[in-house]
Amino acid sequence: MKITFESFLYGMPSRDYIHQQADYDTQIQAAARKLKQADYVLIGAGAGMSTAAGAKYGGTFFEDHFAEFQERYGKGSYMQDMYSAGFYPYPDEESYWGYWSKQAMLGGICLDVTPLHKLLLNALKEKNLFVLSTNADGQFEKAGLSTDQIFCTQGDYFHIQCANACHNKLYDARKLFKQMDQARNNCKIPTYMVPKCPVCGGPMDMNLTG
């Protein structure tokens, strides 16, 4: 059976799939058969997968780990969760990296691989896999896939880049973020730790999109 972009499990147009004609058990069995027959598998993963696996971004988790940032910047619309806080207009680079180094640590670097990600990849270990993900937490790499099998459309928590885009190279910042995390004081890092582009000398930025 030829699969087109409009097809789903039962050959019906995906635009009509909201009107389901089979129960979930039947759909799951059909999906399992197709996965077994497939030579190549493309995994699409969004924030819902990491959330289902137990990742925390807001609520009491944010209040417990980012209380000093809420105290300094207020509990307005920004300081509610790790997503919103990333858009706060931090007054200087020391403050910007003071926040982002912590988010990188808690949102990616310090996270262990989740059982859900390991379970998924183990179930598909005999297949040729590629992952297209909007997640920045690096879970698929931690679960065992090589970086050439993963494309993170919104970047990740592990790299930084020239804010002026003077060149395309990404720089691994995991060691730097750990140092920033230890040196942070009053939500800011020391000025000497602020990263600068090695090519143009300008500011650096997270390898992330909004």
Language-model segments: what does each one mean?
Residues 1-210:
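Conserved catalytic core of sirtuin-type NAD+-dependent deacylases
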